UniProtKB/Swiss-Prot annotation:
Organism, as annotated: Methanosarcina barkeri (strain Fusaro / DSM 804)
Regions that span the bilayer: none
One MF annotation (Gene Ontology) recorded for this entry: structural constituent of ribosome
Biased composition (Basic and acidic residues): 95-107
Name of protein: Large ribosomal subunit protein uL4
Biased composition (Basic residues): 82-94
Function, in words: One of the primary rRNA binding proteins, this protein initially binds near the 5'-end of the 23S rRNA. It is important during the early stages of 50S assembly. It makes multiple contacts with different domains of the 23S rRNA in the assembled 50S subunit and ribosome. Forms part of the polypeptide exit tunnel.
A GO cellular component annotation in the UniProt record: ribonucleoprotein complex
Pfam families: Ribosomal_L4
NCBIfam families: rpl4p_arch (TIGR03672)
UniProt GO BP: translation
Family classification: Belongs to the universal ribosomal protein uL4 family.
PANTHER family in alphabetical order: 60S RIBOSOMAL PROTEIN L4
InterPro entries, per the entry: Ribosomal_uL4, Ribosomal_uL4_dom_sf, Ribosomal_uL4_euk/arch, Ribosomall_uL4-arc
Amino acid sequence: MATAKTIDLTGKVVREIELPDVFDVDYRPDLIKKAVLAAQANRLQPYGPRLYAGMETSARGWGSGRGTSHVPRLVNSSRAARVPHARGGRRAHPPKPEADRSEKVNTKERRYAIRSAIAATRDPTLVSLRGHIFEAELPIVTENALEDLDKTKQVIEFLQAIGVYEDVLRAKYGRHIRAGRGKLRGRKYKHKKSVLIVAGESAPILKAARNLSGVDVATVDSLNAELLAPGTHAGRLTIWTESAVEKLEGAFQ
């Protein structure tokens, strides 16, 4: 069974604890990617054109005998309309709002993906490949006193003490304008992910830390593959409290 060093709010090691078996699970990037993509697909909002888009016109066909193509044309004009190959006409095969774009994942696969992503948080190689900046030894396990921090300033001081605040700054100054049409559709900027803090239920830190750039907060019960592996890439820089680690015992089986 693997062990981890528990640190206090100043970054000093206070004791060593045994980690649950979930931290020894094999790394399965295929299952992690499958679970994350399914979660993203299930958030999609139905979309499609208006029911009569491109059809609101008085155009009608001339029929045969005029030596022209049999396409609907505007009244008192030779301009074609309504058909897909005409300017301003309807789309030939538009997306259907009634289409089912959701994806299903087997329960055992989804749970294994979460366990595998949890185990990846203690692998320095995977965490570094995600671009995280850290000096602390992984996995980062803290005393339960961390849960009582109720001011964002206190959280920043703690992150500086353990050597991971540079990762928050990386997310803060790493914001950039998105390429493509998405910038016109309410998602102008792309944001980087930094630290994930996992604490107990109703802990004050869940509110104190959530406004830091790229930081996500969660309880063990609310963990999912996307939180642990943003963009399908496992190895997120994660801070666990002792109570959260204890609750991982037997979780996601």
